């Protein structure tokens, strides 16, 4: 590009070559956008007020204070009716994907979106389960292809498909739920990654919020909304799977430290998370 950028970012066309540096990395948070001072304040409060609890072993699903806070947050922002007992926390969605495979079984056919997030398919394949690639159109995953490939579990991102950005309309969401209800043992993994940053149009309800057959396992993470290094993710199990989960996988230790869990719980409960999301929406719009 011919020209130069002077100190106040004004562009002047003076015939000289000018280079721009553009960061296209999708999972990075600029240091200026993270509320370090607030996070540090809450960490100090947790150390003082939760010193005994910090030394206790957390339940395998995570500390109840954070799970209650997430449950309330989901009701307020995703119209989801959940009980804290349905929520399982873990260090990253990859860890939760592995738990789901062990929970539902290695003998099922797992369907992923094509195109889609490459790591999801890699995780399924590394667990030696059959993984089918299902095409996506302008409304999301194609339901007829799920039947054609004899899928048992559909792993989808209906609120913000990666990499196309497609948002699955309500009509298609009901089609997907209908597919899951037609055969016993079918489930939908709703990956709601990045749903906080819907910048245009009216919000669409989470698939889990309109699921009356208990076939949706909802997954989300704070890696995008806060920072990728804050490895706190969670899933919401159907009530019918809670007992199965603890009978099969209750021996696992929670992979998120008590310290981070208590800090995040306060960050959400005290309203800082909502303020942060609103500020980041404005940042991304501009």
Place the predicted regions along the sequence by residue:
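Short histidine/acidic/glycine/proline-rich micro-motifs that form metal-
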Residues: 28-31, 161-163, 194-197, 251
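N-terminal basic, amphipathic alpha-helical segments
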Residues: 1-44, 250-257, 265-268, 274-286
């Amino acid at each position: 590009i011919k020209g130069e950028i002077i100190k106040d970012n004004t562009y002047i066309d003076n015939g000289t070559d000018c280079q721009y540096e553009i960061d296209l990395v999708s999972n990075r948070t600029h240091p200026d956008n993270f509320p370090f001072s607030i996070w540090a304040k809450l960490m100090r409060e947790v150390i003082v007020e939760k010193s005994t609890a910090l030394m206790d072993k957390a339940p395998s699903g995570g500390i109840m204070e954070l799970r209650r806070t997430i449950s309330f947050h989901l009701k307020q922002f995703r119209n989801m009716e959940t009980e804290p007992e349905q929520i399982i926390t873990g260090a990253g969605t990859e860890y939760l994907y592995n738990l789901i495979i062990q929970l539902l079984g290695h003998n099922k056919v797992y369907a992923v979106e094509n195109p889609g997030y490459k790591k999801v398919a890699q995780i399924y394949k590394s667990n030696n389960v059959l993984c089918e690639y299902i095409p996506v159109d302008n409304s999301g995953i194609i339901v007829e292809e799920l039947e054609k490939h004899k899928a048992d579990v559909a792993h989808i991102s209906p609120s913000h498909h990666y990499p196309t950005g497609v948002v699955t309309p309500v009509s298609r969401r009901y089609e997907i739920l209908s597919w899951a209800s037609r055969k016993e043992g079918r489930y939908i993994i709703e990956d709601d990654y990045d749903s906080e940053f819907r910048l245009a149009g009216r919000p669409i309800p989470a698939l889990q919020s309109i699921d009356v057959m208990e076939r949706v396992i909802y997954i989300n993470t704070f890696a995008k909304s806060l920072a990728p290094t804050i490895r706190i993710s969670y899933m919401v199990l159907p009530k019918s799977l809670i007992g199965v989960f603890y009978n099969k996988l209750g021996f696992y230790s929670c992979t998120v430290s008590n310290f981070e869990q208590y800090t995040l719980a306060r960050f959400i409960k005290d309203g800082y998370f909502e303020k942060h999301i609103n500020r980041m929406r404005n940042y991304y719009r501009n």
